[in-house]
Design a protein with these regions (language model features):
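Basic/aromatic-rich interaction segments and small domains that mediate binding to polyanionic partners
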Residues: 2-45, 49-50
Length: 51
């Protein structure tokens, strides 16, 4: 799944940038952020671009 980050407050993600969701775990998205590390993020911070 591809998602676009729609918030401004996270230093490891870029506003309006598209990210690939590696997996969905307990309702959160596992995404590789701009530092190259993967973390869990809240779905409400993203807009789904492609399922």
């Amino acid at each position: 799944m591809k998602v676009k980050y729609i918030k401004k407050t996270n230093v490891s993600l870029t506003e309006a940038k598209t990210y690939d969701v590696m997996s969905v775990e307990k309702g959160s998205y596992r995404i590789v952020d701009d530092t190259g590390e993967d973390y869990l993020f809240q779905p409400e911070d993203f807009e789904i671009i492609e399922k």
